């Protein structure tokens, strides 16, 4: 199933809020996981696993390091 950018953003915001405690309203496409949202590598792995389950995509560990912003993850899921 193809998801819209808004559906993915809303889903990611919910996941990030649950895992890292960042309010969903602060999660916007241009935000960097490390610099803006203060998410560490362990939380990033948890977010990736939750996103894989929610959106039915696979995000290999070697790809995870290239996903620096929320928009990067949105683009990856839409591929």
Curated annotation (Swiss-Prot):
Report the coiled-coil segments: none
Pathway where it operates: Lipid metabolism; fatty acid biosynthesis
Q: Tell me, which GO biological process terms does this entry list?
A: lipid A biosynthetic process
Q: Can you name a GO cellular component term?
A: cytosol
A molecular function (GO) held by this record is: acyl binding
Q: Would the keyword Phosphoprotein be found if you checked this record's keyword annotation?
A: yes
Quote the SUPFAM superfamilies the UniProt record gives. ACP-like (SSF47336)
Domain of life of the organism encoding this protein:
Bacteria
Chief place of localization: cytoplasm
* Record key words, sorted: Cytoplasm, Fatty acid biosynthesis, Fatty acid metabolism, Lipid biosynthesis, Lipid metabolism, Phosphopantetheine, Phosphoprotein
Signal peptide positions on this chain: none
**One short Pfam family name for this protein?**
PP-binding
Which residue ranges run through the membrane? none
What does the entry's PTM section describe? 4'-phosphopantetheine is transferred from CoA to a specific serine of apo-ACP by AcpS. This modification is essential for activity because fatty acids are bound in thioester linkage to the sulfhydryl of the prosthetic group.
**Sites of the modification O-(pantetheine 4'-phosphoryl)serine?**
41
Ranges of residues in domain Carrier: 6-79
Question: Which PANTHER family does UniProt cross-reference here?
Answer: ACYL CARRIER PROTEIN (PTHR20863), CARRIER DOMAIN-CONTAINING PROTEIN (PTHR20863:SF76)
Purpose of the protein: Carrier of the growing fatty acid chain in fatty acid biosynthesis.
Which protein is depicted? Acyl carrier protein
Recite the lineage of the species.
Bacteria, Bacillati, Actinomycetota, Actinomycetes, Streptosporangiales
């Amino acid at each position: 199933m193809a998801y819209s950018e808004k559906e993915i953003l809303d889903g990611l915001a919910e996941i990030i809020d649950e895992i890292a405690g960042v309010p969903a309203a602060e999660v916007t496409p241009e935000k960097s996981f490390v610099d803006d949202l203060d998410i560490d590598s362990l939380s990033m792995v948890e977010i990736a696993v939750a996103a894989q389950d929610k959106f039915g995509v696979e995000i290999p560990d070697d790809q995870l390091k290239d996903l620096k912003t929320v928009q990067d993850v949105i683009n990856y899921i839409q591929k």
